[in-house]
Each structure stands twice: as C-alpha cells, then as structure tokens.
C-alpha cells in the first residue's frame, strides 16, 4: 500500500491497478498452460497486502471519488503530496496517529478543491469489512502453497488504526511471517525492510518470490536477488506464480463463489429434476456455486455425477414486464447453435416454478477464460488485438445469421428497432425510477427526435461485450457467447456500439471496468473508431455517420439497467454484489450518454452541406488574379490585401431568408429554440435573479445549455477568418453570425445559453487568435465546453480607460514569473463562481512607445493576491451571478508562460479582440430593439386611453414608425460593417465599426425608451425585459469605448479619406 514509488515517477503516475490513470505496460506472461519447473529452489512466497491480497488504496479512492462526486485523482494527489515527509508516508512509519493523518490529509484535499472534502468517509471505506476482503483467488493460492510445505509472508507498508491496532484484515494463520512498516518504522522500498523479512523467514533472497503491485518496490527486491512478480490483477499474478512454482494453485471453478444466502435455491428438488433430465442414477452430492457475473439473472455452476452444468434462472420477486426473459435466452441459443455461432449447448428449459422457485434453463458448462478486465492485463499487445478481433468477428457472425433458415424470423418485430427500444427503456426506467436525474430527462426527450433514418434487421445480442464471451485458454478464439437475455431482432449497430462501452468508461468503474484511461496504442487494443471500421469492413458496410447517436442510446440503456438493478437491490432482489452501488452510477452513466447526444448535435450541424466558405458569393472578395494568389482564394489575415473599393461578386445579405440554405436552416432552428425553450423560461430565470440563490448559476440555465449543445446551437460566434478550419466554432462569417446574434439578442439569457455571451466570447477569440497550444488546452477548451467562465480586467478607476494606453496596473518580471499589482473595476463576470480565468491587461514597460507599453496575462482566479473589494451595481441591478466587481491585484505571481503573444502586445490584442465583439454588441442591441418594439405594439393594441386604443393615438403611431425606421437604419449599417470585415478585414472596416458603435446603443436607448413610455409604470418592472434592455443599452454607450471616442474616430477618418 506504499505510494513512495509515485514520487520517483517522472510523470507522477500512480501504478495502483484500478486508479483513474493510464495502465503501464504489463510484462509478458506467456502461455496459460501450467508447466512444472523441475528443480525449483523456492521455499517462500512473500505478499504485499494492498493491491495484491486486498483492493489497493488507489482502487478504493477511485470508487469513492465517483460515488462522492470528487474530481478523479484528488485522493491520490493528496496522498502523494510531500513525498517521504508527507502525511501518508509518515502515517505508514507510525510517526503520526490516524487522527493526525486525517487532519493533515483533509487539509490538503480541501486546499486542492477549495472546499471541504470528507476524508473520514474515504478512510472508513478503505478500512471497512466490505472493501478490505482478501481476494478468493489469493486465499486459495496461499492454501495450496502451504500445503506444499512452502512458507508464506506478508510484507506491507501499513498503518495503525485509531484503536492502536495495525490495519491487517487477514487471517494471520495463513502466514509464517508478517512485517509491517508501522511496526518497524521503515517503508518499502528501503532495503532494510526486505532483509528483515528474509531474516525472519531464515532464507536467502534467491529462495523467495515477492508479489507487489508497485514497480519501485519490486525493483529494490530484485536488486537484492528476490524473484519478483508484478501484480496487475490477482488472477493473472497467480497464473505466473503457478509457472514459477511448478504446481497448481487454483482448483475451483473460475469466477464462482459460494451461493449468497439471499440467492440460495433448494438442492433436493433441483437434484431430482437433474437426475430425471440426465438419466443419472448416482446418489452422490450436488455441488452448487454462484457465478460472480450475471447480476440480472442469477447464474449457478452445478457439478453432479461428473457432469459440469450451468443454470440460469429468473430472480425472485415481482419483476418488470418482459424483463429477465430466460425463455428467450434458451430459444435463441438453441437456434444459433445450428448456424455456427459459438454458444453453450443448452439442455432443457424448465418453466415450472415449483422446482426452484422461478423458471430456469440448464446448459453444459463451457470451460475457458472470461476476461473481466477489458485491458487484458498479462497479455502481449498482439494477443490483446487478436482477442478484440475475435470478438468483432463473432459479432459479425451473429449479425449474418439467416433468420428464416434458423426459424427466428418471428423472434422479434421487423423494423423500427431503435424507436421501440427507446420506448421500452424509457418505460423500464420510469418503472424503476427512484429520483429525478436531469440527464435522463434530457435523453428521454432527445432520443426520439434524433432516430436513425435507416436500419438493418438482424439478430442482436443486446448485451454484447467482452465479459460475456468465453475464450479458449490459449488461442484468441471465442468458444461461447453468454447472456442472451436481451436478444431480439433489431439494428445491429446497437450491438456494435454497446460492445464499445468499455472504451468510454474509466478503469475503476465499479460495475463494468473500462479502458478510457488506458494507452490503447501501447496495449495493442483497437480504439472504438477502429473497432467499428473493422466491423464495417467484415460486414461489407459503409461506415455510419451517426455513431454518436448509437453510443448515446447504448449508455442510456445502461443507465436504465443500472436503475433497475438499484431498485431491485432495495427489495433484496438483485443478485450482484455491486447492485447497491448502482444508484449513484446511474447518474454518472446518463451524463456520459448526454455527452454523446451533444456530440451528435455538433456533428449534424458541422456536416451540413455548407458551400465552400472560400467561394461564397456574398462574402468572397474577388481580387485580381496573380501568380501569388490563385483565383477564389482568400487570406484569413485581418490585414486587407486591397482597397475596399473592390466589391464582391455577391451582395450584402440583409435578411435571414437570403442566407445560404444551411445557415438559414440554422437560423430557423435557433428561432424555434428561442420560442420553445428560452422565452418560456424567462420568468423563472428572472425570479432566480431576484432570489437569495442569485449568486449561484441557475439550474435552468445549465439545463438550457445542454439542450442548446444537443441542437448544435453552441459556440456559433467565432468568425471564419479567426478559425478557418472550423476547429473551434461553426465557421460562420461575420454577416451570417450577425443575423443569429440579433435573434439571440431578443432575450437577455439566450447568449449565455448558446455560449455566445461576453466577456467569454472575446476571451475565447483572443485565445484562438493569439494563444499558444498550451494556453488553449488549459483555458480555451473549458470555455468552449461551457465548463468555465472568464473575465477581462482592463478598466481602472483612476484613469480614463477608454484610452487603453492610460492603463496603470503594473506587470513586473521576477525570475520565472510576472508579478501583477493594480486596481481594476467594472470587471464583468468576476463574481461568477464559475469564473476561472481573468484576462488581465497591464503595463510591462512604461518607457516603451505608448502602444507598446501594455501586455496581456492569463491569470487563474485561484491565484493568491486577487482581492474582490465589492460588487458594483448598474442602475441598482446586480447582474447576478456574474456581476461586476472592483478588484485589487496585490503581488499576484503568474508564470511567464501565461503571457499572451509577448510583452508589449497588449494594445494590439485588445483592439483585435474588440472588432467582432462590437458587431456582436450592436446586433444584440438590435435584438433588444426588435423585442422592445414587438412588446410595445402588443401593448398599445390592448390598452385604452381617453376612450380609444393607444394604437390610435397619433404620438404612439409616430413612435412606432420612428422606431422601425431607426432599427432598419442601424441594422443595415451593422450588416454593412460585418460584410466589409468579411471582405477586407477588421482594419479596412475601422470606419464602419466606429460608426455602428456610436449609432446602435443610442438607437436602442431611444427605441426601448419609447416602449417603456407606452407601457407606463409596468415598463420599469421586472415583469418585462424592457428595464434591463434599457440599462445595458445605456451602458454600451461607453463600454468598449464611449460614443465620443467613436465620433472623433469617424470624423478623423472622414476628413482623411474625403478631403
């Protein structure tokens, strides 16, 4: 249980077998045959405890983190903290008590996560009887070793419990010698502790074998002359130990255990039934064991009169309709055996519940290997690949069965398999639901709307995965496919996706171990995409495009199954030891399913038949052809290559209906989303902003974000010229996005719902344009995924911040850091609990030219020295949860690699960030204005004043007309600016950008003011969005530069170009 080796690892990777980290390369274990090594001189076997005899702390930590929603790796990182002098190592040398360890350990974890971590709960789980049980395969091996006259020992890095007894949940009678670090004051890999163990055994190093799960401990033992075995999983380690000792250590049936008391069946009546079935006259005893796998239908091993059998039965109690259909299992296996599909030989189906309590069937036992760990520890990479190839091949064989030839044409309904399955699993889930799981609710709504258009019909297994296959002990050959309970006729791609579940689950997932955190290339295991291509090649099919849908559906099924197991565990019906854990796992798996639904939404959008952006007539700038610039190409630089006098071959797109078909379809999809999702949610969102919980993100907003992702309405803002490969965004031009931005602007909440809100949009564009790959990986990706938020710190209270060169905050170089000092205010979004990044602008060289004095740094919000002085209000509005803060930066130390683009480039970065952002602001303002005018028109039609409707009043009519004219004027001007940016770049559009920034906010203020006037006092209330519209329209008259600055810019450019 030592973590010492981790301190010496160059990448600080833990090698505990079931941690959430990559597997290391396993040694070659050779053949599975037992070979007697004649002349063996081994006289003792020495065992580590954690990871060898009982589950390792890493495995327990990973399980506990999942169940308690603690970020994976937290416990291991805290255990590693401090190296030899850290609390964990001192605890194992008995230098501190359990109480002292938990106090220091808890402090470390809490500092990492900035919140309290219940480490007592982890320690209780680690030392509990439920977890700290000796592996049966090791118990059996120790028994056989001692029966042969060899000594056994435990050599463990261990600790004292609060009762002052060492943690040793083992039968001490199994061992001749026990050496524990807490009793000796030294830990592995200190050579003294190995020598002490050998001295107590009275042996030389070469006469012993040492088993440990940590490479560093084994290395020191090997240096002393002890033979070592690396334990990646107990069963594989026992096989290697058998080869070294030359005799068998396992005499039982693999993967079985004594029958649980709640799963016992009457032996007498079963024995009578089997004697009649098999014609057996013997009076010998019936041996009955229970298989570890098969949590849905209890499965038993039976030995009677030299016959090895397997019995599968329905679980007891009231069951969901159509579930646990063992009758169908019997029928399908009997039919497929005649079609060359490897299945066990079934003998009889007994539907008489009086025999053992529920219906069951009996089949012959098929000896072989069942690989419960999909990483296949102990095998060569080539053998692992061969195993997965064989798995793929047998799946193709199942899907190629002639239904009519084997009499299975009525085994299920033909066609519409996925729709029926969705309905079935929704029904099953609802029947076993114990609480509301948001991701499941979203999937229940999403799946029926995204069904595959074309489906083939074959036999489908329904639960096809590696641990439902029996393999030949020595060859990569499938001997039998098990667990046919969910089989039917349906879409074969559902089987293919289901067989890839492990590729997306962590290795420590309690119910189905995964390989998501393994290096598949190193292991030799095909990635999910390669596995799917392999299947398509064998079946002669083109690859499907909607792979993500099938994965979403598969994980949705798993979540529904886990929920059913959990519900049955509450009544004692489920047979698996994992059943009670599945309550929390259902939510984990449903979130995975939703992730695939989101990916499918992105795929649908990105694979729309967009016209090549380089040849769109409405934004491609046709330049004179030259040898350096082929016809139709375009530079993505913001520097114009010719005069804006050159016009494009297409016109300005002034209406959404004139957009290209795919973008027009996107616009209408967004409009439908706004009408169906966003507008109806506004009252609840407004109530949240006024509630005591307003400084926490609204759960409804988060739910709407997930729905927007799934609909492909996410990250639409990045302009094509900044992201020409569409790597990060939708690849829209400024004009295309302007129309969508206006639509989002009709609601205060829509930009955030679609991840298109400031200041994140500007910061993400900054990172795309100027960030290093490391900066993008650290900050851009979480922002794009909506997992983090950010702020931009430029405005200062002591200077006119409209002139960026006035910035006084200092950035001083010190060793490998920059030290920041400064006073900022009106920092939008800094109060948001999700804000993880502050993009900070400060002065690095006050003696440089004015436009080269400023620099931009990426500052993590958890950096010491950032002090929020107070929140600021706008006309009394707090704008929670993001808010606007006044902040001091006092001696804030930031690594040099957090500098953006380089020292002295801050002004350039700020200007580059503002160009598209001003288009966004202005189009949102036009959205404000359109919504305000629509509300005004509806209001004046329904109100009477002085005996006639308001709509008939002359002044009201004049206001409506004036508002319409001003909106249209502003829209045309903004679209023209966006069009020019698409054609010639930001610099060439500087005049137009300045004009729209001085026009749009003033226009919006006037239009909204007229609407408020028409509403009267109601217009000032939070019952309508008008008051907030007006607030932000007014604020934008100086945000991103005051109107006066833009008027001056326009005048200077006018004089420069026109005189």
Curated annotation (Swiss-Prot):
Widely expressed with highest expression in fetal brain, followed by heart, muscle, kidney and adult brain. Expression levels varying from isoform to isoform. It catalyses: a 2,3-saturated acyl-CoA + A = a 2,3-dehydroacyl-CoA + AH2. Signal peptide: none annotated. FAD binds at residues 792-802, 828, 943, 1013, 1044. One of its GO terms (molecular function) is acyl-CoA dehydrogenase activity. Keywords: Acetylation, FAD, Flavoprotein, Oxidoreductase. Its EC number is 1.3.99.-. Pfam families: Acyl-CoA_dh_1, Acyl-CoA_dh_M, Acyl-CoA_dh_N, APH, Hydrolase. One of its GO terms (cellular component) is cytoplasm. Its cofactor is FAD. GO terms for biological process: fatty acid beta-oxidation; fatty acid beta-oxidation using acyl-CoA dehydrogenase. SUPFAM superfamilies: Acyl-CoA dehydrogenase C-terminal domain-like (SSF47203), Acyl-CoA dehydrogenase NM domain-like (SSF56645), HAD-like (SSF56784), Protein kinase-like (PK-like) (SSF56112). The modification N6-acetyllysine is found at residues 427, 1052. The modification N6-succinyllysine is found at residues 413, 427, 1052. It is an enzyme of class 1 (oxidoreductase). Belongs to the acyl-CoA dehydrogenase family. PANTHER family: AMINOGLYCOSIDE PHOSPHOTRANSFERASE DOMAIN-CONTAINING PROTEIN, HYDROLASE, PUTATIVE (AFU_ORTHOLOGUE AFUA_1G12880)-RELATED. NCBIfam families: HAD-1A3-hyp, HAD-SF-IA-v3. Acyl-CoA dehydrogenase only active with R- and S-2-methyl-C15-CoA. This is Acyl-CoA dehydrogenase family member 10. The gene is ACAD10.
């Amino acid at each position: 249980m030592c973590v010492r080796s981790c301190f010496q690892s160059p990448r600080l990777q833990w090698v505990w077998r079931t941690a959430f980290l990559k597997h290391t390369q396993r040694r070659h274990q050779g053949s599975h045959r037992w070979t007697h090594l004649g002349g063996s001189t081994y006289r003792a076997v020495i065992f580590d405890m954690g990871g060898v005899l009982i589950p390792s702390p890493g495995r327990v930590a990973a399980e506990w983190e999942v169940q308690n929603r603690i970020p994976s790796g937290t416990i291991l990182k805290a255990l590693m903290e401090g190296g030899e002098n850290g609390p964990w190592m001192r605890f194992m040398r008995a230098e501190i008590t359990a109480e002292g360890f938990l106090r220091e350990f808890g402090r470390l974890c809490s500092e990492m996560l900035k919140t309290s971590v219940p480490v007592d709960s982890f320690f209780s789980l680690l030392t509990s009887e439920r977890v700290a049980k000796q592996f049966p395969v090791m118990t059996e091996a120790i028994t056989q070793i001692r029966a042969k006259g060899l000594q056994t020992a435990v050599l463990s890095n261990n600790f004292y419990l609060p009762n002052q007894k060492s943690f040793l949940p083992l039968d001490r009678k199994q061992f001749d010698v026990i050496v524990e670090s807490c009793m000796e004051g030294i830990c592995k890999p200190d050579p003294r502790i190995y020598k002490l163990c050998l001295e107590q055994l009275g042996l030389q190093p070469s006469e012993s074998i040492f088993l440990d799960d940590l490479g560093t401990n084994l290395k020191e033992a090997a240096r002393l002359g002890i033979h070592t075995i690396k334990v990646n999983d107990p069963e594989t380690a026992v096989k290697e130990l058998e080869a070294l000792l030359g005799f068998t250590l396992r005499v039982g049936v693999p993967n079985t255990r004594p029958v649980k008391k709640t799963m016992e069946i009457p032996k007498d009546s079963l024995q009578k039934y089997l004697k009649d079935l098999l014609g057996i006259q013997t009076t010998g005893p019936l041996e009955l064991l229970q298989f570890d796998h098969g949590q849905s239908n209890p499965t038993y091993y039976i030995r009677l009169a030299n016959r090895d059998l397997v019995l599968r039965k329905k679980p007891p109690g009231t069951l969901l309709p159509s579930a646990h259909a063992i009758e169908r299992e019997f029928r399908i296996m009997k039919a497929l055996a005649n079609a060359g599909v490897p299945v066990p030989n079934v003998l009889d189906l007994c539907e008489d519940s009086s025999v053992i309590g529920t219906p069951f069937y009996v089949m012959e036992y098929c000896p072989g290997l069942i690989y419960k760990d999909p990483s296949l520890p102990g095998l060569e990479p080539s053998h692992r690949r061969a195993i997965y190839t064989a798995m793929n091949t047998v799946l193709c064989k199942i899907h190629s069965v002639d239904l009519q030839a084997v009499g299975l044409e009525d085994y299920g309904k033909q066609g519409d398999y996925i729709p029926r399955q969705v309905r079935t699993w929704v029904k099953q889930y609802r029947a076993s639901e114990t609480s509301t799981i948001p991701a499941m609710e979203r999937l229940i709504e999403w799946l029926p709307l995204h069904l595959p258009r074309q489906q083939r019909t074959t036999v489908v297994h329904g639960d096809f995965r590696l641990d439902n296959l029996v393999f030949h002990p020595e060859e990569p050959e499938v001997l039998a496919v098990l667990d046919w309970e969910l089989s039917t006729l349906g879409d074969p791609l559902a089987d293919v996706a289901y067989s890839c579940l492990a590729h997306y689950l962590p290795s420590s997932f309690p119910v189905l171990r995964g390989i998501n955190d393994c290096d598949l290339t190193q292991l030799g295991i095909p990635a999910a995409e390669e596995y799917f291509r392999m299947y398509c090649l064998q079946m002669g099919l083109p690859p499907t495009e909607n792979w993500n849908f099938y994965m979403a559906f598969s994980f949705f099924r798993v979540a529904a199954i886990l929920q059913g197991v959990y519900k049955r565990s509450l009544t004692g019906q489920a047979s698996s030891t994992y059943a009670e854990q599945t309550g929390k796992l259902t939510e984990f798996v449903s979130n995975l399913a939703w992730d695939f639904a989101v990916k499918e939404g992105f795929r649908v959008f990105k694979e729309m038949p967009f016209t090549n952006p380089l040849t769109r007539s409405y934004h491609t700038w046709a330049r004179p052809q030259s040898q350096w610039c082929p016809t139709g190409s375009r530079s993505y630089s913001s520097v114009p290559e010719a005069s804006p006098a050159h016009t494009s071959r297409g016109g300005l797109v002034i209406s959404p209906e004139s957009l290209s078909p795919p973008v027009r379809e996107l616009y209408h999809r967004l409009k439908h989303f706004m009408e169906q999702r966003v507008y109806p949610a506004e009252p609840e969102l407004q109530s949240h902003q006024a509630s005591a919980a307003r400084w926490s993100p609204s759960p409804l907003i988060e739910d709407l974000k997930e729905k927007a992702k799934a609909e492909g309405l996410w990250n639409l803002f990045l302009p094509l010229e900044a992201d020409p490969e569409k790597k990060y965004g939708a690849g829209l031009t400024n004009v295309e996005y302007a129309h969508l931005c206006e639509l989002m602007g009709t609601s205060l909440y829509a930009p955030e719902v679609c991840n298109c809100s400031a200041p994140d949009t500007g910061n993400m564009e900054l990172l795309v344009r100027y960030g290093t790959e490391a900066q993008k990986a650290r900050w851009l990706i979480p922002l794009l995924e909506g997992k983090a938020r950010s702020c931009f710190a430029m405005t200062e209270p002591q200077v006119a911040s409209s002139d960026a060169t006035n910035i006084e905050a200092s950035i001083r170089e010190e060793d490998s850091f920059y030290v920041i000092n400064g006073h900022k205010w009106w920092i939008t979004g800094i109060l948001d609990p999700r804000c993880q990044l502050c993009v900070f602008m400060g002065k690095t060289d006050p003696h440089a030219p004015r436009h080269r004095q400023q620099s931009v740094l990426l500052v993590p919000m958890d950096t010491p020295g950032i002090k929020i002085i107070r929140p600021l209000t706008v006309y009394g509005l707090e704008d929670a949860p993001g808010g606007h803060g006044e902040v001091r930066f006092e001696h804030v130390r930031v690594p040099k690699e957090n500098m953006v683009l380089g020292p002295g480039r801050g002004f350039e970065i700020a200007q580059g960030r503002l160009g598209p952002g001003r288009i966004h602001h202005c189009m949102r303002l036009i959205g404000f204005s359109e919504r305000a005018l629509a509300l005004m028109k509806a209001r004046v039609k329904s109100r009477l004043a002085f005996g006639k409707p308001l709509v008939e009043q002359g002044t009201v009519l004049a206001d409506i007309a004036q508002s319409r004219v001003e909106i249209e004027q502003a829209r045309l001007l903004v679209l023209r600016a966006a069009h020019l940016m698409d054609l010639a770049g930001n610099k060439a559009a500087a005049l137009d950008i300045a004009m729209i920034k001085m026009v749009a906010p003033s226009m919006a203020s006037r239009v909204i003011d007229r609407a408020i006037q028409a509403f009267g006092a109601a217009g000032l209330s939070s019952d309508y969005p008008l008051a907030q519209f007006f607030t932000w329209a007014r604020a934008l008259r100086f945000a991103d530069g005051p109107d006066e600055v833009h008027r001056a810019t326009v005048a200077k450019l006018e004089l420069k170009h026109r005189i």
